[in-house]
């Protein structure tokens, strides 16, 4: 991962256009190719970003501070396969470092979440009549989807399971769906957000994004026989 703290302007050119005026920002370039622009607020959310697959090239702009040997500012052009661009004009750099993080083991679920995943995989009909399990922990470039299933019509469904369903979980599933829907062997992929409790804000966000919410009764699921599929 490369971390750059720089005075910069940012322009996004694609289906829409967006402009960030000159300010000091943190630029993250990850090993997967993604580039994101952060301010000192908004928690983990970037001001703008480009998801992989995308490619970064550095060129010289016109005029500006001495950020290159010729005295011209450096322009980062981040482009994806659709031709959308994130253009970052670097006016000055305060910090630039690279770090090798290695392979991350991924999020380790607590006991209840892990057991919920196991139980729902075993009793997949709780998702709906005709559902079948493709596999647990279906890997994506950003981590594993809890369950990958097929509905009664054979369409692909990705299921994210939480003990407490909050906005972060919906955002996580949204990112999984974005990646899975790029796979022509799986698309279109629908989403199910399953949890013991789902906060109203998370439910509203999920439903707005076309993600179905499912409340899980952990005690009832633990009491089900392993060879029985029934709704509670």
From Swiss-Prot:
Signal peptide: none annotated. InterPro entries: Endonuclease_NucS, NucS_C, NucS_N, NucS_N_sf, Restrct_endonuc-II-like, tRNA_endonuc-like_dom_sf. Its EC number is 3.1.-.-. SUPFAM superfamilies: Restriction endonuclease-like. Keywords: Cytoplasm, DNA-binding, Endonuclease, Hydrolase, Nuclease. Its main location: cytoplasm. It is found in: Cytoplasm. GO terms for cellular component: cytoplasm. The keyword Transit peptide does not apply. It comes from the Bacteria. The keyword Zinc does not apply. Pfam families: NucS_C, NucS_N. GO terms for molecular function: DNA binding; single-stranded DNA endodeoxyribonuclease activity. Belongs to the NucS endonuclease family. Cleaves both 3' and 5' ssDNA extremities of branched DNA structures. HAMAP family: NucS. PANTHER family: ENDONUCLEASE NUCS (PTHR38814:SF1). This is Endonuclease NucS. The gene is nucS.
């Amino acid at each position: 991962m490369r971390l750059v703290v720089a005075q910069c302007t940012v322009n996004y050119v694609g289906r829409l256009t967006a402009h960030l005026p000159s300010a000091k920002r943190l630029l993250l370039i990850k090993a997967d190719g993604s580039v994101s622009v952060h301010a000192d607020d908004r928690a983990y959310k970037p001001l703008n970003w480009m998801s992989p697959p995308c490619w970064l090239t550095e060129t010289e702009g016109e005029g500006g501070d001495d950020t290159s040997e010729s005295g011209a500012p450096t322009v980062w052009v981040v482009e994806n396969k659709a031709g959308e661009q994130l253009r970052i004009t670097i006016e000055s750099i305060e910090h630039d470092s690279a770090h090798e993080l290695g392979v991350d083991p991924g999020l380790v679920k607590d006991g209840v979440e892990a057991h919920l995943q196991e139980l729902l995989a075993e009793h997949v009909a709780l998702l709906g009549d005709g559902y079948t399990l493709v596999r647990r922990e279906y890997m994506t470039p950003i981590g594993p989807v809890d369950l990958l299933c097929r509905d009664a019509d054979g369409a692909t469904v990705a299921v994210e399971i939480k003990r407490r369903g909050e906005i972060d979980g919906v955002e996580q599933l949204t990112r999984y769906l974005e990646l899975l829907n790029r796979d022509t062997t799986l698309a279109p992929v629908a989403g199910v957000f399953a949890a013991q409790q789902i906060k109203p804000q998370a439910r509203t966000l999920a439903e707005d994004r076309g993600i179905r919410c499912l409340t899980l009764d952990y005690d009832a699921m633990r009491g089900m026989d392993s060879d029985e599929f029934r709704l509670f």
